[in-house]
Amino acid sequence: SSIVFFSLEINEISEKSLKKIYADKKLNIYKNWIKNIRKFKPYQLDVKTEKLLQEKSITSRSAWVRLFDDTIASLKFPFKGKNLSSAEIFNFLSDKKESNRKKSAEVVSAVLKDNISLFTSITNNLAQVNSIKDKWRGLPNPVGSRNLSHVVEDEVVDALTETINVNSP
């Protein structure tokens, strides 16, 4: 949770002080990183609430992410007479041979489909956790924090989503 306070403190630095920091060649390399952190400033909560959210993430968001990671790591993918790990089968998705790419994609799809209930539950819970957190922060939409993290405007994501929806079968 101490990393939370690092971001909070960066957001407390005055613009005047930041100009001095950016003027220093050794510190200027952090300019974009600092600017990205400061984009969250309007949505920052008080210190106690930020600490609560951070500590709560251990049993909410982090737990779901860990369950996903552990599940993916434990899956076995039958491919060419062997049971491969996720890392091994995913390598075949970019294999030189088209037949290997196609077969590995089919295997991955089949194994993931067998676990669709669990992955759906994980995805829905993660979406709900983010939605609640973003609502508390006053972000304009449920994916606002993701867009800020990825340094992309909501309108760009909306336009991309619309284009995909219009052009998908």
State each model region's role.
Residues 1-169:
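A well-structured
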